From Swiss-Prot:
Pfam families for this protein: I-set, Ig_PDGFR_d4, PK_Tyr_Ser-Thr, VEGFR-1-like_Ig-like
Catalytic-site annotation from UniProt: 818
Protein source organism: Gallus gallus (Chicken)
Annotated glycan sites: 44, 75, 88, 102, 353, 359, 458, 468
Sections of the chain in a coiled coil: none
Gene name per UniProt: PDGFRA
PROSITE patterns referenced in this protein's UniProt entry, alphabetically: IG_LIKE, PROTEIN_KINASE_ATP, PROTEIN_KINASE_DOM, PROTEIN_KINASE_TYR, RECEPTOR_TYR_KIN_III
Compositionally biased spans, kind Basic and acidic residues: 1000-1011
Known partners and oligomeric status: Interacts with homodimeric PDGFA, PDGFB and PDGFC, and with heterodimers formed by PDGFA and PDGFB. Monomer in the absence of bound ligand. Interaction with dimeric PDGFA, PDGFB and/or PDGFC leads to receptor dimerization, where both PDGFRA homodimers and heterodimers with PDGFRB are observed.
Membrane-side (Cytoplasmic) residue stretches: 550-1087
Lineage summary: Eukaryota, Metazoa, Chordata, Craniata, Vertebrata
Protein's name according to its UniProt entry: Platelet-derived growth factor receptor alpha
Residue ranges constituting the Protein kinase domain according to the UniProt record: 593-954
Length: 1087
C-alpha cells in the first residue's frame, strides 16, 4: 500500500515550507462548525479541531477559566485531531477559542487559524473577568484603542462611563469591548441585569505622547558626604513611562548600590528611580549618571551629578571684617562671616562671654544657609550705643570641628560737654570755671573768652586762652569716671564776660558758654530772680484755686420736667425750667415771714423752720419750711433755686408732695416757702419706731441689725440726714444789702426778726373728721395720733401714698431723679409728702451719694440706664420706687448690705443682681419690688398701675378714706390750692368756686390725670372759674364767723385751736398782742 497523495503534499510543504511561501495548508476545522455559540451556565461543552498538521488550541485565560482539558486523538484518515473539553462552564470561559497549526507564527499574541466564540451567560457575572495587566492600557497618542469590558451574554446592553460617571459614547462589540479614541484616564462599563446594575473592572488608559526627547532630571539630597553615610540619588523621567533606565556611577563595577522604582504618578506622568549606596567611602566620589531610553523610539537622555565624599567633617571661616572695628555712635553696622562647613555647624555670637540672643531690639544676630555647604552669619548693630563696646566672639561647631573668631568693637562717641559751672571764691573777684567733657576718643578741651557781650554772637570776638596770661590759670585731668575735667581760673573779674568751653575729638566739636558777672552785679540779679520766683508762685496758686473752684460741685435741682419729642414717648428733652413762667401770685411779703431754727443744712443751702403770717384767712399764722441758699452761693446756684421754684409752680398742689406755699424773690435772697412736715423724713421716722413695730409684730424677731449697719442704741452714726430741731449752722443775714433795695422783715414782739419757735399748737397733730372704719388698723392708717405706733398697714399706706404722689409727678412730665426715703417727709396724720431735700443735705460727705465728675449721685437708688447711659425717665423713677419699698419694709435698712459702690457693684447690677426680700415685706410686696427692678425699662409698671397694685393690698375702706382726704384738700383754702385758682380778691385768697360742679370737674380732671400719667405729655388740671363779685361778697361777710366751722367741714387742712400740754400763756399772749384771735387760729393738718 503506497502513501496517500495528501500525505506527500503535506510532507512536501514541510520540506519546502521555509522556502516556499506559496505552499500553505488549508485551515483546521472545528466541530461544531460555527462562528459563535452560547453555552448554558454550569454545563459542559466540547470543541474538536482537526487539521493536516499538528494543531493546538488558544483559549481565553482569565481568573476562574480553569477546568479546561485538551487531549489528542488518532484519526485513520491521516488528520491530526485535538479535543478541548470544558466542564462546569462559567462566565470566565467566555471568549475566542482558536485552533491553529503548531508551526504558525505568533504575531502580537495572535495566531492564524480557525476560531469560534463561546458565550456563557451568567446573570451574576455579566462581565467577563479580566487580568490585571489588561486593565492598564497603553496607547500611542492619536491611535484608537479597545477597552476590553466583554460580556458573558451577547444580548447585554453596556454603557461606558468616565471618572466623573458621565457616559462616553463609542462603538461596542461584545467580543472585544468598546473601540474608539479615548482620553487618558479611568473608565468603567455598566450593564443592567434584571433591574440590577453591574460594573466592570476599572480600565486605565495611558496615552504615550509622541515626543522627540525625554525630560530627565537627576536629584541628590546632598552632594557632599562623609564616610559611613548613605548616598541617595534620584532620577526622574517625565512625560513618558515606557522607558529603559541605566545608572553609571563609581561603584557600579562592584555592583554596589540598590536601584528602586519608587512610584508611578499617572496624573503627572512621572517615573522616579532611586539609587541608594550605603556606607560610602572616599573612593565613591565621582559622577553619578542616569540614562533614559525610549522603549519604542530612538530617543535617549542622560543627566549626572557630582558627589564628593570627605573623610570627616570640616569648617572654613572667611570673616569680612578686621580684628579691630570702630563704629560711630548711633551708626548701623553689619559684621558678616562667610562659612564653608559640613555637616552644618551651630553658630553663636558672644559679647564679653555672654551669648547674644537672636532678634534683640538693638543687636540682631542671624545665620542662614547660602548653598549646601556655604553659610553666612551676620551681627547687626542698630543705632550703636556706647555700652556696645567690647570683645565679640564668634563660635562655630559641628560634629567634627570647632572654630572661633574674636574681634574688638569700639564705639566712637562725639565729644560731649556734661557740665559747665563757675565757682565763686571770695569777694575779691576770683572765679573758677569747670568744664566736664567725655567722648571716644577722649576729647581735647580749649577755653575762649569774649569781653564784649554784645558782639559775642560773632566768632571773631572770641579769644583763645593760654597759660601765658598772668591772671589766668588752666589745667586738665581725667577723673575716676574716665572723663576729662578742665578748669580755668580768673584771678579777678572786673566786668561781665563770656567764657566758652570747646571739647573736640575725631567726630567733631561741641561748645558751651556761660557769663561771669562781676561781684557788684550779682546781688542785683539775685533780688530780681527772687521777685520773679515769687510772682510765678502767685500765678500758679491762682490757677490752682480757679481750677479747684470750677471743680467744686454745684447745686442742681434733681427734679426735671421732660417733653416728649416722639410719638411713642421714648425720646424726650429736658424742659429748661428758666423758660417756665413765674406767676407773681406766689410772691409773699418778707415782712410776713419770721425765721426760726435750721431744719437741715447742706453744702449749698439750708431749710429753716419759719412762721408765715397771712397766707390764708383760715390760717393767719402757719408754721412753714423755708428753703434758701447760703450767703456764699454763686449765681448758678441762685439760678438753680429759681428753677426749682418755677417747677414747683408748674406742678401745682397734691396731697402727697411737699406743696409750694409762696416765695420771696424780690429785694433780697430767694426764699421758697413750703409746707412744714412734723415728723421729718421717713428714714428717721422708721428708725425711731422700729422697736415699736417689732413689738407689735412678734412674728418678726429682732434679728441682728447688720442690715442697718449700726447699734440701735446709737442713732448718731446714721448716714441719713435727720430733720431734727438742732440750732446748728448760721442764719442767712436778713439785713439790707449794700447794693440792693431790701424790704425788712416785719418786727414782732420785742422787735425780734428771728423767732425761736417753741413747740406749740403747730407741733400738735390736728384731727380729721372722718367716718369710722370697720377695722381698727384702718382707723389708724391716716390718724393724727402718733402714739398709735407703726404697723405693717402703715408701711403699706406709705407705699401707696408715694405711688400716688409719683403718679401725680409723672402726669406733669416731672422726673424726680432722687426718689428715696430721705426725700420722703411725713406730715401729721401720717400723710407722706415727696420732696427734694438736696439743698439742705451735705451730699459731699453723705455716703449715699457717689462723686461723678462735678456732681454727686445716689447710685444705689438709680436705675441701670441712669447709671450707665445717663438716661432719666419716669420709668427710672419706678426703679427708685422699688428701692424705696425695700427701705420702707426693712425699716430704714442700708441698701445692698456689705457692698461698696465700686466696679464689682456695677458689674453685679449689669448681670442682674437684685436685693433679697427684706424681713418685713410680704411676698406680694417683694413681687412689686422685683417688677420695678426689671432691667428693661419698658417692662416696669407705671406709677398708675403701682398704685392700683398697692391699693389691692390695703383694706377696702382705705381708698375711700384717702380719696376723701385728698378731695377735701383740693377743696380747702390751703395756700397751695388757692394760689392755683384765680386771683379773685387781692385782699383775700380764699375758697372761691362758682358752684359744686367745678369741684366735680376737678375730681374728674384728677382721675383723667391719673389715667394719663404715663402719656408723656403735660396734662394740667382744669381751671376753676371764680365766683361772681356778689357771691364773693356774701361769702366774705360770713367768713370771719364761720372760719372755724368751714375748716372742720373741709376736714383737710384746718382744725380748731386746742391748747397743748407744753403750750404757755405767753404764746397766747404773743398772738393776742399782734391782733390775732386765737379762736381763728387754724393749722393745716397736712403740715
Amino acid at each position: 500500500m503506497g502513501t496517500p497523495p495528501r500525505t506527500f503534499l503535506i510532507l512536501g510543504c514541510f520540506l519546502t515550507g521555509p522556502l516556499l511561501t506559496l505552499c500553505q495548508l488549508p485551515l483546521p476545522t472545528i466541530v461544531p462548525n460555527r462562528n459563535e455559540m452560547v453555552v448554558q451556565l454550569n454545563s459542559n461543552f466540547t470543541l474538536k479541531c482537526s487539521g493536516d498538521s499538528e494543531v493546538s488550541w488558544q483559549y481565553p485565560v482569565t481568573e476562574g477559566s480553569h477546568r479546561i482539558d485538551i487531549r489528542h486523538e488518532e484519526n485513520n484518515s491521516g488528520l491530526f485531531v485535538t479535543v478541548l473539553e470544558v466542564g462546569n462552564a462559567s462566565a470566565a470561559h467566555t471568549g475566542m477559542y482558536v485552533c491553529y497549526y503548531n508551526h504558525t507564527q505568533v504575531e502580537d499574541g495572535e495566531v492564524e487559524g480557525k476560531d469560534i466564540y463561546i458565550y456563557v451567560p451568567d446573570p451574576d457575572m455579566p462581565f467577563v473577568p479580566s487580568l490585571p495587566e489588561d486593565q492598564f492600557i497603553l496607547v500611542e497618542e492619536g491611535d484608537p484603542t479597545v477597552i476590553p469590558c466583554r460580556t458573558s451574554d451577547p444580548s447585554a446592553e453596556v454603557t461606558l462611563v468616565n471618572s466623573l460617571d458621565k457616559p462616553v459614547y463609542a462603538f461596542y462589540d461584545s467580543k472585544q469591548g468598546f473601540v474608539g479614541n479615548f482620553l487618558a484616564g479611568p473608565y468603567t462599563c455598566k450593564t443592567m441585569v434584571k433591574g440590577v446594575e453591574f460594573k466592570s473592572d476599572e480600565f486605565l488608559i495611558y496615552i504615550l505622547r509622541a515626543t522627540s526627547q525625554l525630560p530627565v532630571e537627576i536629584e541628590a539630597l546632598k552632594t557632599v558626604y562623609k564616610t559611613g553615610e548613605t548616598i541617595v540619588v534620584t532620577c526622574v523621567v517625565f512625560d513618558n513611562e515606557v522607558v529603559n533606565l541605566q545608572w553609571n556611577y563609581p561603584g557600579k563595577v562592584k555592583e554596589k548600590g540598590l536601584i528602586k522604582l519608587d512610584d508611578i504618578k499617572v496624573p503627572s506622568q512621572k517615573l522616579v528611580y532611586m539609587l541608594t549606596i550605603p556606607d560610602v567611602l572616599v573612593k565613591d566620589t565621582g559622577d553619578y549618571e542616569c540614562t533614559a531610553r525610549h522603549a519604542t523610539k530612538e530617543v535617549k537622555e542622560n543627566k549626572k551629578v557630582v558627589i564628593t565624599v570627605h573623610d570627616k567633617g570640616f569648617i572654613h571661616l572667611e570673616p569680612q571684617f578686621s580684628p579691630l572695628e570702630a563704629v560711630n555712635l548711633h551708626e548701623v553696622k553689619n559684621f558678616v562671616v562667610d562659612v564653608q562647613a559640613y555637616p552644618a555647624p551651630k553658630m553663636y555670637w558672644l559679647k564679653d562671654n555672654v551669648t547674644l540672643i537672636e532678634n534683640l531690639t538693638e543687636i540682631v544676630t542671624s545665620s542662614n544657609r547660602v548653598q549646601e555647604t556655604r553659610f553666612q552669619s551676620v551681627l547687626k548693630l542698630i543705632r550703636a550705643k556706647e555700652e556696645d563696646s567690647g570683645t565679640i566672639l564668634w563660635l562655630l561647631k559641628n560634629e567634627d570641628e570647632i572654630k572661633r573668631y574674636t574681634f574688638s568693637l569700639l564705639i566712637q562717641v562725639p565729644a560731649l560737654i556734661l557740665d559747665l559751672m563757675d565757682d565763686h571764691q571770695g569777694s575779691a573777684g576770683r572765679q573758677t570755671v569747670r568744664c566736664l567733657a567725655e567722648g571716644t576718643p577722649l576729647p581735647d578741651v580749649e577755653w575762649l573768652v569774649c569781653k564784649d557781650i554784645k558782639k559775642c554772637s560773632n566768632d571773631t570776638s572770641w579769644t583763645l586762652l593760654t597759660n601765658n596770661i598772668s591772671d589766668i590759670h588752666m589745667e586738665a585731668h581725667l577723673d575716676e569716671r574716665n572723663m576729662v575735667e578742665s578748669q580755668v581760673t580768673f584771678q579777678k573779674v572786673e566786668e561781665t564776660l563770656a567764657v566758652r568751653c570747646v571739647a573736640r575729638n575725631d567726630l567733631g566739636a561741641v561748645t558751651r558758654e556761660l557769663k561771669l558777672v562781676a561781684p557788684t552785679l550779682r546781688s542785683e540779679l539775685t533780688v530780681a530772680a527772687a521777685v520773679l520766683v515769687l510772682l510765678v508762685i502767685v500765678i500758679i496758686s491762682l490757677i490752682v484755686l480757679v481750677i479747684i473752684w470750677k471743680q467744686k460741685p454745684r447745686y442742681e435741682i434733681r427734679w426735671r420736667v421732660i417733653e416728649s419729642i416722639s410719638p411713642d414717648g421714648h425720646e424726650y428733652i429736658y424742659v429748661d425750667p428758666m423758660q417756665l413762667p413765674y406767676d407773681s401770685r406766689w410772691e409773699f411779703p418778707r415782712d410776713g415771714l419770721v425765721l426760726g431754727r435750721i431744719l437741715g443744712s447742706g453744702a449749698f443751702g439750708k431749710v429753716v423752720e419759719g412762721t408765715a403770717y397771712g397766707l390764708s384767712r383760715s390760717q393767719p399764722v402757719m408754721k412753714v419750711a423755708v428753703k434758701m441758699l447760703k450767703p456764699t452761693a454763686r449765681s448758678s446756684e441762685k439760678q438753680a433755686l429759681m428753677s426749682e421754684l418755677k417747677i414747683m409752680t408748674h406742678l401745682g398742689p397734691h396731697l402727697n408732695i411737699v406743696n409750694l406755699l409762696g416765695a420771696c424773690t424780690k429785694s433780697g435772697p430767694i426764699y421758697i416757702i413750703t409746707e412744714y412736715c412734723f415728723y421729718g423724713d421717713l428714714v428717721n421716722y422708721l428708725h425711731k419706731n422700729r422697736d415699736n413695730f417689732l413689738s407689735r409684730h412678734p412674728e418678726k424677731p429682732k434679728k441682728d441689725l447688720d442690715i442697718f449697719g449700726m447699734n440701735p442704741a446709737d442713732e448718731s452714726t446714721r448716714s441719713y440726714v435727720i430733720l431734727s430741731f438742732e440750732n446748728t449752722g448760721e442764719y442767712m443775714d436778713m439785713k439790707q444789702a449794700d447794693t440792693t433795695q431790701y424790704v425788712p422783715m416785719l418786727e414782732r414782739k420785742e422787735g425780734s426778726k428771728y423767732s425761736d419757735i417753741q413747740r406749740s399748737v403747730y407741733d400738735r397733730p390736728a384731727s380729721y373728721k372722718k367716718k369710722s372704719l370697720s377695722e381698727s388698723e384702718v382707723k389708724n392708717l391716716l390718724s393724727d395720733d402718733g402714739s398709735e405706733g407703726l404697723s405693717l398697714l402703715d408701711l403699706l399706706s406709705f407705699t401707696y401714698q408715694v405711688a400716688r404722689g409719683m403718679e401725680f409727678l409723672a402726669s406733669k412730665n416731672c422726673v424726680h431723679r432722687d426718689l428715696a426715703a430721705r426725700n420722703v417727709l411725713l406730715a401729721q396724720g401720717k400723710i407722706v409728702k415727696i420732696c427734694d431735700f438736696g439743698l439742705a443735705r451735705d451730699i459731699m460727705h453723705d455716703s449715699n451719694y457717689v462723686s461723678k465728675g462735678s456732681t454727686f449721685l445716689p447710685v444705689k437708688w438709680m436705675a441701670p440706664e441712669s447709671i450707665f447711659d445717663n438716661l432719666y425717665t419716669t420709668l427710672s423713677d419706678v426703679w427708685s420706687y422699688g428701692i424705696l419699698l425695700w427701705e420702707i419694709f426693712s425699716l430704714g435698712g442700708i441698701l445692698y448690705p456689705g457692698m461698696m459702690v465700686d466696679s464689682t457693684f456695677y458689674n453685679k447690677i449689669k448681670s442682674g443682681y437684685r436685693m433679697a426680700k427684706p424681713d418685713h415685706a410680704t411676698n406680694e410686696v417683694y413681687e412689686i419690688m422685683v417688677k420695678c427692678w426689671n432691667n428693661e425699662p419698658e417692662k416696669r409698671p407705671s406709677f398708675y398701675h403701682l398704685s392700683e397694685i398697692v391699693e389691692s393690698l390695703l383694706p377696702g375702706e382705705y381708698k375711700k378714706s384717702y380719696e376723701k382726704i385728698h378731695l377735701d384738700f383740693l377743696k380747702s383754702d390751703h395756700p397751695a390750692v388757692t394760689r392755683m385758682r384765680g386771683d379773685c380778691d387781692n385782699a383775700y385768697i380764699g375758697v372761691t368756686y362758682k358752684n359744686e360742679d367745678k369741684i366735680k370737674d376737678r375730681e374728674s380732671g384728677f382721675d383723667e390725670q391719673r389715667l394719663s400719667a404715663d402719656s408723656g405729655y403735660i396734662t394740667p388740671l382744669p381751671d376753676i372759674d371764680p365766683v361772681s363779685e356778689d357771691e364773693l361778697g356774701k361769702r366774705n361777710r360770713h367768713s370771719s364767723q364761720t372760719s372755724e366751722e368751714s375748716a372742720i367741714e373741709t376736714g383737710s387742712s384746718s382744725s380748731t385751736f386746742i391748747k397743748r400740754e407744753d403750750e404757755t400763756i405767753e404764746d397766747i399772749d404773743m398772738m393776742d398782742d399782734i391782733g390775732i384771735d386765737s379762736s381763728d387760729l387754724v393749722e393745716d393738718s397736712f403740715l
